[in-house]
Amino acid sequence: YKISRYLWYSFLKMQKQVAPKLQNIITPSQSSKKGIIEEFNCKKDNITVINNGLDTEEFSPIVGSVRDPNRLITTASADVPLKGLDYSLKALKILKKDNPNIHLIVIGSYKKGGHTERLIKELDIKDNIFFKKHLSKEEIRELYSTSSVALVSSLYEGFGYPVIEAMSCEVPLIATNVSSIPELIGKYGILIDPKDENQLSNKIRIVLSNYEDYKKNAIQGRQHIINTFNWSKITHEYEKAIFKTI
């Protein structure tokens, strides 16, 4: 999925003219850097990659919390095809056949009468899916801390905050191998092909069946997030980029 497929904002026409003339462009991932080079005809030496940061204390596992072995969690703007929620819903349908108690928490909302609501009805998973909206960061943290597996089934992410938020809360993560996601995860999560609910459901089964092993990897994943995306490091990188430019 290239950046060009989603050039729906009119201001991007102006950016195509301006971007090649800029001395330094800062972007949050190697994937987005590649897209800028291809779509805006910019020189690679004029683009600096600085990750977005995360408050890893706000997104941290709650001590003493118990993870529900039947609870999956995802963050998605329902009815937005890019977020790939359809494939998480279809995977849930597959898993429900063997485990009627499995359920998916979706941090987000859906449009009344929209595509997502219709798909949920078609798949007969209404009792297995719960949408949560207008949550505080502490409430999001609580949901992550009581979930066993986090899903990111996006088709494109310039920078996937749901990826690093879940990892910071030590939730074993399964995510699609697209755009920026692999560089965020490193070796601390499971990558799957996009648009493949069968592969997704199979990986969920594997994680739940070997949970202690994936839990250990998730603990290491949190340390990776702390080391890579802490605001002190990000701020220092911005300072260097700014001073280099001026």
Tell me the role of every PLM-derived stretch:
Residues 155:
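Aromatic "clamp/platform" in nucleotide-sugar-dependent glycosyltransferases that forms part
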Residues 172-175:
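Short hydrophobic beta-strand element within catalytic cores of glycosyltransferases
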Residues 31, 53:
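Carbohydrate-associated surface elements
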Residues 190-197, 206-211:
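Conserved acidic donor-binding segment of nucleotide-sugar-dependent glycosyltransferases
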Residues 134, 142-147:
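Short alpha-helical donor nucleotide-sugar binding micro-motif in glycosyltransferases
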